[in-house]
Amino acid sequence: MGGVAGHAGLFSNAYDLAQLYQLLLNGGSLNGTQLLKPATIQLFTSYGSTSSRRGLGFDKPEKDNATRKDPYPSRNAPPETFGHTGFTGIGVWADPVNNLQYIFMSNRVNPSRSNNLISQLNIRSQIQDAIYESIRR
C-alpha cells in the first residue's frame, strides 16, 4: 500500500465515544430507543475464538490476564470487558460487569509517529488499573 494503511483515520471526541459505548453497555438501546439488537451486541463483544483476545468487533482482555507481566487492557478488567486501543493513543473500553466506561484520548503520534512512550510506560493500562482500584476501595 505504499506506506498508507486503512487504520488510524477515525477521529471522535469523548462525548460521542461515551454515547456509543453507552449504547453498547445498554444492549443496543440509547435514550429509550433500541438501535441494535442485544444479540448483535453480544456477538460483537464476545471472544471470536479460543486462541485470540480479538472479538468480531472489539478487543477483549487477554485470557491469562491474572498471570501476565503486562495485562491487557488492565489487570482488573473482567473477561466481559470490550474495547479498543488505537495507534494514535486512544483507549476506549466498556465493562458491563461494573457498568463502566474508560475513555482515554491522547496524541501519541506527537511530535512524531515514532513517539511510543505512552506504550512503553503502559500509561493506558496503569490509569485503568487505578480506576478499578479506586472503585474497589
Predicted segment positions?
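Catalytic loop of the DD-peptidase/beta-lactamase superfamily, centered on the K-T-G motif
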Residues: M1-R137
